[in-house]
Amino acid sequence: MIAIYPGRFDPVTLGHLSVARRASGFCDRLIIAVFDNPAKPGLFTAAERVDFIKQSIKDFPNVEVRSFSGLMVNFARKMGASLIIRGLRVGADFEREMEMYVMNRRLDEGIELCCLFSEPQYQYLSASLIKEIVILGGDSSGLISEHVAVALKNKLASV
């Protein structure tokens, strides 16, 4: 089975990587799909985000990383995927994922959704919160990979 784990990953967190690691255990191939939305650019380019994830998943043998734009179900179809993986942190995530599930099912009934609860230490972790912590001079260790932390500090210093 081929699964897609989509997201912005701006930047990728240890919570994201935890979901990817767990999902890779029950699918033959997992594609981490970095959403590239030109209308809403992030702090990092899609290419930078793909590179950060590639550096972080070297030990995940059945996981690959690609960027995509447009509808996620179209990308999933193109990749031959039948499952979308999403991580759930807090209650608001459930509501958003339910909305997306209903719309994705309307667009393609052949693609299922699997939501994985975040591990407790990552329940309130978000890319936005990471950026705020770093901007305010806080310690991001244990929240993002070291190579991502260095790139984030450098990027924020130049903004």
Curated annotation (Swiss-Prot):
One of its GO terms (biological process) is coenzyme A biosynthetic process. Homohexamer. The record marks H16 as: Transition state stabilizer. NCBIfam families: coaD_prev_kdtB, cyt_tran_rel. Belongs to the bacterial CoaD family. This is Phosphopantetheine adenylyltransferase. It is found in: Cytoplasm. Its EC number is 2.7.7.3. ATP binds at H16, G87, L88, R89, E97, Y122, Q123, Y124, L125, S126, A127, S128. Reversibly transfers an adenylyl group from ATP to 4'-phosphopantetheine, yielding dephospho-CoA (dPCoA) and pyrophosphate. Substrate binds at K40, M72, R86. It catalyses: (R)-4'-phosphopantetheine + ATP + H(+) = 3'-dephospho-CoA + diphosphate. Pathway: Cofactor biosynthesis; coenzyme A biosynthesis; CoA from (R)-pantothenate: step 4/5. Its main location: cytoplasm. Its cofactor is Mg(2+). It comes from Dehalococcoides mccartyi (strain CBDB1). Keywords: ATP-binding, Coenzyme A biosynthesis, Cytoplasm, Magnesium, Nucleotide-binding, Nucleotidyltransferase, Transferase. GO terms for molecular function: ATP binding; pantetheine-phosphate adenylyltransferase activity. The gene is coaD. One of its GO terms (cellular component) is cytoplasm.
